[in-house]
Amino acid sequence: LMINLEYFSSEDWVDDFHLQESFLGGNLKKYFFIPGLSEKSGGIILDKEFLDRKNKVQENREYYLKQFNINENYDLIISVFSYEKNFDNFLKTLQKLDKKVLLLLLSEKTQKNFIKYFDNNNYYDKIKAVKLPFFTYDKYEELLALCDVNLVRGEDSFVRALLLGKPFLWHIYPQDENTHIIKLESFLEKYCLNNKELRETFINYNINKDYFSYFFKNLDEIKKYNEEYCDYLIENCNLIDKLINFIE
């Protein structure tokens, strides 16, 4: 038995091709195991260490705030991990909220996106930005669990954001001919098919036509929805369980 573990995809074709059989000759068979977000797909990795870490951070919030040197009270703490993009409208929307906001900027590329906005004290109106150094992925997971909102990039942090049940936006890796937008739309059809405003927020975030008003006005509603979606993933999309059950 040979199992070919493929790349993650939320596109519809995954349901048809997951566990397709390929004959290699003799008695050897190969199966394509494709991770995804539907019950018919291979699911996503739900490692116990991450879920335990998530619960630990949420149960000991004050301790972890100190671990990340967050010693003031903020109305909103947001992590930002992005590719190159313009954040003009993002910051204008945060300004209009009239709340005390902390932005935690990860990676040099992300930090360069924000250089023009902040003075020497790292303040932009009531918004404070902090450049975070490189740290381990375990610590990044703790940070995601600590923040109220997470702006993530790539697939690993995207899956983690899904499993936290918190408001998030995904900056998908840009590809030629807008192939990445097709992939993003496939995800959104599974994630929030009936929420036009949220779908448009995700898409606009990835084409620099940002409009964040709906997102920040409805954080509580989005959080509740994401918690329910997280429960669905844990219940129906556990890659390890699916793999073990298939082998058995």
How should each PLM-predicted stretch be described?
Residues 36-112:
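Active-site donor-nucleotide binding/catalytic segment of nucleotide-sugar enzymes
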Residues 15-23, 93-94, 114-123, 183-185:
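Short, aromatic/basic amphipathic alpha-helical patches
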Residues 167-207:
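Nucleotide-sugar donor-binding patch of glycosyltransferase catalytic domains
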Residues 98-133:
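Catalytic donor nucleotide-activated moiety binding site of glycosyltransferases and closely related
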Residues 1-5, 32-35, 104, 130, ...:
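Hydrophobic/aromatic beta-strand patches that form the interior of the parallel beta-sheet core
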Residues 134-183:
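A donor-sugar binding/catalytic signature common to diverse glycosyltransferases
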Residues 46-47, 68-69, 192-248:
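C-terminal amphipathic helix plus adjacent low-complexity
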Residues 1-63:
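Active-site-proximal region of nucleotide-activated glycan assembly enzymes
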